[in-house]
Curated annotation (Swiss-Prot):
Associates with the EF-Tu.GDP complex and induces the exchange of GDP to GTP. It remains bound to the aminoacyl-tRNA.EF-Tu.GTP complex up to the GTP hydrolysis stage on the ribosome. This is Elongation factor Ts. One of its GO terms (cellular component) is cytoplasm. It is found in: Cytoplasm. Belongs to the EF-Ts family. Residues 80-83 are annotated as: Involved in Mg(2+) ion dislocation from EF-Tu. Transmembrane segments: none annotated. Its main location: cytoplasm. The lineage of its organism: Bacteria, Bacillati, Bacillota, Bacilli, Lactobacillales.
Amino acid sequence: MAKITAQLVKELRERTGAGVMDAKKALVEVDGDMDKAVQYLRDKGMAKAAKKADRVAAEGLTGVYVDGNVAAITEVNSETDFVSSNDKFVNLVNAATKTIAEGKPANMEAAEELKMADGTTLAQSFVDATATIGEKIVLRRFALEEKTDDQEFGAYQHNGGQIGVITVLEGADAATAKHLAMHIAAMSPKVISPEELDDDFITDQLAVMNHKIDQDNESRALVNKKPLPYLVYGSEKQLSDEILAKAKEDIKAELKEEGKPEKIWDKIIPGKMQRFIDDNTQVDKQFAVLSQNYIMDDSKTVGEFLKEKGAKLVAFQRYEVGEGIEKKQEDFAAEVREQMK
């Protein structure tokens, strides 16, 4: 039987990331054959990963990697936020994001077949990480953006990688592209312009906003405050020429009733019309980045800011760890009872 030396154990640990006892046991099982020991640990890791497959992994990190005219963004999930500060986990996120940027896979299946720097497939790297770290580790999603030489990438990660953003801008410098990425990280838009918002989505969001107004009005009634009006429209897509014309006529009628001289109406109407538009484009302001007030200068919208710069937002990607995943609610008392059986 081969002698299992400390050097052999160290080498196997460096190749696989396994713990000391697991590495030593693997070498004993295969009589000191390094390649067989690596495979033994991988097989063991796949078994561990299979046992963890039904666990909810909703924590983790985003990864952002930019190289020349290609940028990649990923979300890698773990079961607990404690793991997100683990060096092995962080290194895996960075390496996987770089591999995806370089390989430019068309879908998740193609991404999983990409080879990492050590020759391991991306899929196997996540199996190995699950075994080594002891939690379910998964690549949940990724996106690629490409630009031309005269365009600019902006990249930003917030809160230690909990949010990641990539922007592609035309006619802008790197600083503007990054500042817009920071805006998107903070304001969570879903689309670039209101035209991209689905009609059913607008209707649903209006219902949500009016429900909130209902709740606010209940509170206002308790202190004898005037109730807030309900929103009729939510997007500029809904504000047809006819609707805007009627709003203008309503404003004129209001000014006439208030006794305002007709000669000053032209000075008052534009401001009131803008207020009408602002009040009736709340869905745009929440979800379309060009309609949002720019966080670096809230006196103007992002669209107005970019127009002043002669710039155009071509594309963006925003990932937030765990968004859309239903997290498991832990019952620690039940868990302890189960362990005591």
